[in-house]
Every structure is written in structure tokens, then in C-alpha cells.
């Protein structure tokens, strides 16, 4: 219902045509996602199904910016990688019915690309945590953890500031180094136990969907191949002879594709450095950067509509157009504020307001700081066009953010 009920959906800049479609297409896309996901699980027409799964899942994520999560971005990337892997080479319907040659082994690049992607997610999340709020003020965990103090056994500990500091520092070191311990055979199983504990705990404390489960199962890919082979032998019988021949050797085009993909993944998260100001405040270059659960922000955005000819002014009830979730997310994200301002301009113009002037009185609090003005209230947002350049109409935070 989150894609059906709201009167307005926030598009990604440059991808406005992918904003939430008509209801029949919404249902059709979800049905396609379900069917293709089942096909991938069973290994049925794997190549087609994996592509359909990637396209449908990613298409759904592009419907509305307000539902963006790093975790969904990660799932899209893993789904994209899966499209190119020979994951149906064994224990699949494709192999059973000889649509593909069963493979007893695969080349290292099929593991390497997954390892790199997992490593980037973890390490970049760790780098993002190297900031004063996270390490020296234990924020936002100092705000979030006490809310779970009623939990049995561990609950009372969560009420202490000391626990927030322990979680903050451990979280940083975990993200920075867990990939190294997973790669090292001598520490792999201890690391896996840590992964299970860490993600189980975060899944319990925070509403982050399937991400903990995804990362726990992803960690099993670091196990020695003999373990996976034993599992295959125990649960799946091979009806056909497996080939030792490498059918998936990586040629020059493949090397270029993988290299380009990795380079992009390494560089893209740092685009925030191209913008002035603190990116945690301005949100510029913030998405797609693995800054996972790094800030606690909330805001209030009161839009004001002024008739350009008569000067008559009115206030907007955001909930008339947006869901509670959309309004919450929009209140501290400037590109969403701008998109909604343009929507309001068009809607009120239809209602007879002459070329409406759209301004906003927006205040935001971040990591427990006092609320501060977020948007220049003198700017007519209906005349501002979005771009990848710096948004000069974002107000600077009056305090110091490190």
C-alpha cells in the first residue's frame, strides 16, 4: 500500500520516469519479482530469472526515494552480480534437465567479485563511522539503545551510556576488519560467529529488514569449498556427470567489466567530498555510500504557498499528499523537499493560484542537537531546478559537526 495510497511519490533525480507507476503495473512488477525469485532459488531458467529478479527489485526501489535504504541498494548490487554467475551449475533444475553442463568447480573470479562487494559494504561502513559523533559522543546509539532497555537479559545494559560507547567502537572495528578475518582461514569460524552475533543483535534492536539475514548467509561464502561440496553431496544427488572443464573463463571484456564495476564501487561513495559543508547535514552525496544507520535526524517542514499576483498566502497540510513515512523522510532531505515544492506549485496552480511561490520553513535536529533552520526560507523553491551541483539554499548548521 505504500506505493498506492500516497498522492505523490518522490522520484530520483534524472530517473523521474521510474516513479511509482499505475496500480496494475505495481502489482505486475511484484508478481514478476516473486516468480523470478522462486525461479532463482530453484535454478529454473536461471539466467532469465536472475535478470528479471534484478530488474524488478531495482525498478521497485526506484519508485520512491523515501524508501531508500543502503540495504536495498546492497540487494540490488548482489542481484546484479548474480546475473553473471554460473550459480545454476549444480543443484538446480537447469542442471537436472541438462539445460546447462553441471560444474564441479567454478573460476575464482566468481567468488572474488562477491568478496569485493561484501568487503566494500563493510569497510566503507566502518570508514563512515570514523567521526566525532559516533566515536566520542556515541551518537546516535546513545539515543537509540535506551529505547530497548525493557528487553530481557540485555535490556538493562542498554540504558547505560557506556554500552553505547562500546557498541559504537566495536561497530567501527567490526566493519573495518571483519572481512579480513573472514578471508583468513585461521580466524574464519570465529569471524563467522561474530557475524552471526552482530547481525542477530542489530536485527533484534533495529528495524533493518532482511539485511542481517542476507549478510549472515553471505558470510558462508567464505567457507572452504570442501564444506559447500559436502553440503551438496548430502542434500543433492547428481543425475549427470559433472564437468571439470572451466566453462566460465574470464576473457578481456569480462576483466574490463569487473574492473570498471569495482572502480566505480570504490569511488562513487566518496562523491560527497565534491560538496561543501557536512554531508551528514546537507545530505548531498549521502546516498549509495554505505553510511549505515549513522545519524538520527528528524525535521519539520511547513510549506507556504503565496499567490504571485495577489500576495495571498496559505499553509500546506503535508499529510494531504504524503504518508507519514514520506513526510518524515522528506523533512530533512533537500532534494525531496525540492521535488515536493514543485509538485505543490503545479497542484495549487491547478486550483487557481497564480504561479504559486513555494517557500518552506524547515527545521531539523541531528543526533540530539537543538533544531536548526535547514532551508533558506526566502528562496522560491518552485523556481529552483534540481541538479548534481551544490544546493546553495541549504542553510549551514549554526553549530559544529565533525
Which positions does each model-derived feature cover?
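Alpha-helical membrane-anchoring segments
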Residues: 1-402
Amino acid at each position: 500500500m505504500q506505493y498506492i495510497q500516497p498522492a505523490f511519490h518522490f522520484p530520483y533525480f534524472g530517473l523521474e520516469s521510474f516513479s511509482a507507476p499505475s496500480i496494475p503495473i505495481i502489482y505486475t512488477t511484484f508478481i514478476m519479482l516473486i516468480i523470478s525469485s522462486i525461479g532463482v532459488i530453484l535454478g529454473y531458467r536461471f539466467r532469465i530469472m536472475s535478470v528479471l529478479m534484478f530488474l524488478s527489485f531495482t525498478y521497485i526501489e526506484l519508485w520512491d526515494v523515501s524508501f531508500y535504504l543502503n540495504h536495498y541498494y546492497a540487494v540490488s548490487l548482489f542481484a546484479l552480480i548474480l546475473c553473471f554467475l554460473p550459480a545454476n551449475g549444480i543443484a538446480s533444475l537447469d542442471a537436472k534437465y541438462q539445460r546447462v553442463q553441471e560444474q564441479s568447480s567454478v573460476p575464482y573470479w566468481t567468488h572474488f567479485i562477491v568478496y569485493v562487494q561484501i568487503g566494500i559494504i563493510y569497510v566503507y561502513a566502518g570508514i563512515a563511522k570514523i567521526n566525532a559523533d559516533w566515536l566520542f559522543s556515541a551518537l546516535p546509539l546513545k539515543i537509540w539503545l535506551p529505547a530497548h532497555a525493557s528487553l530481557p537479559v540485555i535490556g538493562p545494559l542498554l540504558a547505560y551510556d557506556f554500552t553505547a560507547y562500546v557498541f559504537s567502537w566495536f561497530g567501527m572495528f567490526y566493519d573495518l576488519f571483519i572481512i579480513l578475518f573472514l578471508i583468513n582461514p585461521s580466524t574464519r569460524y570465529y569471524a563467522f560467529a561474530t557475524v552471526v552475533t552482530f547481525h542477530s543483535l542489530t536485527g533484534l534492536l533495529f528495524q533493518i529488514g532482511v539485511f542481517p539475514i542476507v549478510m549472515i548467509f553471505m558470510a558462508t561464502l567464505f567457507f572452504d569449498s570442501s564444506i559447500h561440496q559436502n553440503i551438496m553431496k548430502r542434500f543433492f544427488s547428481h543425475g549427470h556427470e559433472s564437468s571439470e572443464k572451466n566453462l566460465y573463463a574470464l576473457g578481456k571484456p569480462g576483466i574490463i567489466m569487473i574492473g570498471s564495476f569495482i572502480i566505480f564501487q570504490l569511488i562513487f561513495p566518496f562523491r560527497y567530498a565534491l560538496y561543501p559543508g557536512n554531508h551528514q547535514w546537507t545530505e548531498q552525496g549521502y546516498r549509495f555510500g554505505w553510511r549505515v544507520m549513522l545519524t538520527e535526524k528528524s525535521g519539520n517542514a511547513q510549506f507556504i504557498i503565496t499567490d504571485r499576483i495577489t500576495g495571498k498566502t496559505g499553509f500546506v497540510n503535508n499529510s494531504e499528499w504524503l504518508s507519514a513515512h514520506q513526510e518524515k523522510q522528506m523533512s530533512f532531505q533537500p532534494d525531496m523537499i525540492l521535488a515536493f515544492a514543485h509538485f505543490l506549485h503545479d497542484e495549487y496552480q491547478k486550483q487557481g493560484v497564480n504561479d504559486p511561490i513555494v517557500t518552506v520553513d524547515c527545521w531539523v535536529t541531528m543526533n540530539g542537537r537543538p533544531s536548526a533552520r535547514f532551508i533558506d526560507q526566502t528562496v522560491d523553491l518552485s523556481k529552483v531546478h534540481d541538479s548534481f551541483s551544490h544546493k546553495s539554499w541549504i542553510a549551514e548548521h549554526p553549530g559544529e559537526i565533525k
